[in-house]
Amino acid sequence: MTLDLDASKKDDKLLLTTVQQEYKILAEYKMIESEKIGGVYVIPSYANSLQWFGVFFGRKDFYSEGVFRFTLLLPDRFPDDKTLPSIIFQQKIFHPLICPYTHSLDISHAFPEWRCGDDHLWQLLKYMQAVFSDPLESIRHVEMDKLKNSEAADLLINNREEFANRTRENIRESLAHIYDTPITEDPHYITFEKFQSEVHGPVLEGIKAGQSKHLESQSQQSNNGGNGGGGGAATGLSWVKEGEFKPLSVE
């Protein structure tokens, strides 16, 4: 009887721990939604909240127009464990911080360890965005022998033209596989469909109409002297101060 009670208590404790973890992960997802990180889309797997599906759209310089799929893996005890999450791309990407064999992004230079309450997944995704936007800046303070792809670093520093050629190969490969059959049956896996005017046309027109109304509203506000005619720019708090990865930095 005592053994049954002990087992029951252990089961209850495990259930409570799991529920608490699920709420923490949901809170992380809500923060990402609020942050609106341009060109980055993620969603937890339907089957496993520790596995997230993601897509990154390159918008600047070397990786512009690339569509790169990745998986975000959270440690079993996330976020209480100091172990770092992992970002693993589905395809090879030529970048000094991405391993050419495992396709994993090295985040340790920005996050030496995971600090529960201080570090958040939206910051991690912003860092990923930053290393693609400015790869040279992302390795400025990293020793060459600590980089995952020293060849990429060498070309980035000494032969930009060849570096650009290699990244364009990555972009072409990413676009060639954008409509591939999903690698999993998980309903949350992000998929793309080719444009069909009869299906997607009305949605596109609705988006255009909404943008037109938004621009018209902005124009009217500008003509009226800004916010409610009071003048002056709005002030307050932002989630992240430009050039930093700290939450709630004063603008």
From Swiss-Prot:
InterPro entries according to UniProt:
Ub_conjugating_enzyme (IPR050113), UBQ-conjugat_E2_core (IPR000608), UBQ-conjugating_enzyme/RWD (IPR016135)
List, alphabetically, the SMART domains matched: UBCc (SM00212)
Gly residues composition bias: which ranges? Answer: 225-234
Matching entries from Gene3D superfamilies are given as: Ubiquitin Conjugating Enzyme (3.10.110.10)
Where would I find the UBC core domain in this sequence? 20-176
The region called Disordered is annotated at 211-251
What family does the entry list? Belongs to the ubiquitin-conjugating enzyme family. FTS subfamily.
> Which protein is depicted?
Protein crossbronx
Q: Which organism is it from?
A: Drosophila willistoni
